[in-house]
């Protein structure tokens, strides 16, 4: 085998191999571009939904916004918070409050809508059977569906010369 080239030994072993293909990064310009893009997105959403998402106030337009207090929301949408206190928004536990709320907005105005699930421990006295195993009381067994159940396949005609 040939010896390694001398150029490979010029790179110190402790340095990273990093290439800047398009020159140095201007952090200020990058921040300005991101801010301009974000402002454009906020303005587009404001015009589309007639709602100011920065100050969280409804605007005049095609939509009529009204406050929903959560009394009609199912408890599925009212997650349990770290505190045990009840909330006046829907009867569920009070959602966790975030310190990142905008200044000037009340914490009571926010309702955190998220889903939560609880894992149930497997009981050792009842072994888990496979869904298709005999003796399970699941009712009718569903079969595996395939794409041709929804889309009918078409036969393709292939014309070829016959062998003599």
Curated annotation (Swiss-Prot):
Residues 153-164 have a biased composition (Basic residues). There is a cross-link at residue 2 (Glycyl serine ester (Ser-Gly) (interchain with G-Cter in ubiquitin)). It is found in: Cytoplasm; Nucleus. The modification Phosphoserine is found at residues 114, 130, 146, 160. The modification N-acetylserine is found at residue 2. A motif (Nuclear localization signal) lies at residues 141-156. Residues 53-58 are annotated as: Required for binding CDKs. Residues 17-24 are annotated as: Required for binding cyclins. The modification Phosphothreonine is found at residue 145. GO terms for cellular component: cyclin-dependent protein kinase holoenzyme complex; cytoplasm; cytosol; nuclear body; nucleolus; nucleus; PCNA-p21 complex. Residues 152-164 are annotated as: Interaction with TRIM39. May be involved in p53/TP53 mediated inhibition of cellular proliferation in response to DNA damage. Binds to and inhibits cyclin-dependent kinase activity, preventing phosphorylation of critical cyclin-dependent kinase substrates and blocking cell cycle progression. Functions in the nuclear localization and assembly of cyclin D-CDK4 complex and promotes its kinase activity towards RB1. At higher stoichiometric ratios, inhibits the kinase activity of the cyclin D-CDK4 complex. Inhibits DNA synthesis by DNA polymerase delta by competing with POLD3 for PCNA binding. This is Cyclin-dependent kinase inhibitor 1. The gene is CDKN1A.
